[in-house]
Regions:
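Active-site-lining helix/loop region of Rossmann-like oxidoreductase modules
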Residues: 1-129
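C-terminal active-site/capping subdomain that shapes the small-molecule cofactor and substrate pocket
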Residues: 93-198
Length: 198
């Protein structure tokens, strides 16, 4: 997500961010992948579905809980995403709300983002900025899907559209293989980009 937002943040400061992540089972390690595989076999064979890694069955299900709960009702994963986003983009005042959901996908996290900016950014401006970003981000006319974004370093961004409820808002969809394109390499590329464009 930050890979997609970094070039937009250069055009105008982000004041508010609302995001929902759809995180693959590989985010829980190889054990998470094995649990999904085993559950799919159990379902196909008509057996009782067992689980150890996730709080409930993940096959044919989604679980809106990643990490443990904080006193504010957000999970540790959600708070990490909020805090890291502010830090990476150098926007400590940015308001962020997010929900992190585990989905029955092997690889590649997906995220729906609504970003609100100080100044209006057109879809054309956003598309051009993301397309010219040198951080392995691909602006897609097709719909990015985890099935096709896995096992590569690119982060795919699509469905860029103006918000219907925020005058200076944009809504977009991102997919990327978090195993190949992890948070650390993203952060380094974003910091390098922001430093070079000060």
């Amino acid at each position: 997500t930050m890979m997609a937002l970094a070039p937009l943040a250069r055009i105008s400061k982000i004041t508010k961010l609302v995001a929902s992540t759809y995180q693959a089972v590989s985010g829980a390690g190889i054990e998470g992948q094995h649990e999904l595989e085993n559950q799919m076999v159990q379902i196909a064979e008509g057996k009782e579905v067992t689980h150890k890694v996730f709080r409930d069955q993940i096959a044919c299900n989604v679980i809106a809980e990643i990490g443990s709960y904080n006193d504010n009702g957000f999970t540790t994963e959600e708070m990490k995403m909020q805090n890291e986003g502010r830090k990476i983009l150098h926007m400590p005042e940015m308001k962020v709300d997010c929900t992190c959901v585990r989905v029955p996908v092997m690889r590649s996290h997906s995220i729906s983002v609504q970003a609100v900016f100080e100044e209006k950014i057109s879809v054309e401006q956003a598309t051009a900025a993301i397309a010219s970003f040198t951080g392995d981000v691909m602006c897609e006319t097709e719909l990015p899907m985890p099935l096709y974004t896995s096992n590569q370093d690119l982060v795919y961004v699509g469905r860029i559209r103006p918000s219907l409820i925020e005058e200076n808002g944009l809504v977009l969809w991102c997919c990327g293989d978090q195993v190949r394109k992890g948070a650390a390499s993203n952060a380094v590329q974003i910091i390098e980009y922001l430093e070079a464009h000060r």
